[in-house]
UniProtKB/Swiss-Prot annotation:
NCBIfam families: deoD (TIGR00107), PRK05819.1 (NF004489). Catalyzes the reversible phosphorolytic breakdown of the N-glycosidic bond in the beta-(deoxy)ribonucleoside molecules, with the formation of the corresponding free purine bases and pentose-1-phosphate. Its EC number is 2.4.2.1. A purine D-ribonucleoside binds at H4, E179, M180, E181, S203, D204. It comes from Helicobacter acinonychis (strain Sheeba). This is Purine nucleoside phosphorylase DeoD-type. One of its GO terms (biological process) is purine nucleoside catabolic process. GO terms for cellular component: cytosol. Keywords: Glycosyltransferase, Transferase. Homohexamer; trimer of homodimers.
Length: 233
């Protein structure tokens, strides 16, 4: 047990899928897993363990932003010996290379947060995913005939007040979208010798102002859930 997770030791399996929204975690458990059981609920940040096609797998919410995400990642790895962490979330696109419903495999995460600089003695940390997980995601997407987009993401500490004039600069440097956790996830996994990867479904486009309806978001997210479960299974 930790300050934020009340699961018993052994409740979490070595492979864990992460979502910012605990209700998405519950949705996946109820609609995609067999023998799913709730194993933690501190602060209503839900976690489940179950099976997908006979393979044991766990699910965990992590909240919004680097600070919240890294708390849960640290406790999952250090206390519960989780070895592989796959975050599936949404992002806002800033590049013409991607559109609504596209799934992005995040190969690198820049950030306006100081957390990684503090962690890395004020140097620039290359926040990147595990190669094996990335390869599995790419190969699984090919098998499922999912057109997986590959590129960098910008992880921001801001949801409402990010500098919109920077969108063109980010796109120039092959940043496909903006979200709030990947840079922290990757850095924490690197520090703790765990494997991590982030997949993001494009829910809105910050340049064209297009956005999915709530129903369309669910349908789009389902494709990413299946990709995640298939590659981790």
């Amino acid at each position: 047990m930790t300050p934020h997770i009340n699961a018993k030791i052994g409740d979490f399996h070595p492979q864990c899928i992460l979502c910012g929204d605990p209700l998405r975690v519950s949705y996946i458990a109820k609609n995609f897993l067999q023998d799913a059981r709730e194993i933690t609920n501190v602060r209503n940040m839900l976690g489940f363990s179950g099976k997908y096609k006979g393979k044991e797998i766990s699910l965990m919410g992590h909240g919004m932003g680097i600070a919240s995400c890294t708390i849960y990642v640290t406790e999952l790895v250090k206390t519960y010996q989780v070895k592989e962490l796959l975050r599936i979330g949404t992002c806002g696109a800033i590049s013409p290379k991607v559109g609504l419903r596209d799934i992005i495999m995040v190969t690198g995460a820049s950030t306006d947060s100081k957390t990684n600089r503090i962690r890395f003695l004020n140097h620039d940390l290359s926040a990147t995913p595990d190669f094996e997980l990335s390869l599995r995601a790419y190969q699984t997407a090919k098998r499922l005939e999912i057109d997986l987009k590959v590129g960098n993401i910008f992880t921001s500490d801001f949801f409402y007040s990010f500098e919109t004039h920077a969108f063109d600069l980010l796109a120039k440097y092959n940043h496909l979208g903006i979200e709030m956790e990947a840079a922290g996830l990757y850095a924490t996994a690197m520090e703790l010798s765990a494997k991590a990867l982030c997949l993001c479904s494009v829910s809105d486009h910050l340049i064209t102002k297009e956005a999915l309806s709530p129903k369309e978001r669910i349908e789009s997210f389902n494709n990413m859930i299946i990709l995640a479960l298939e590659m981790m299974g």
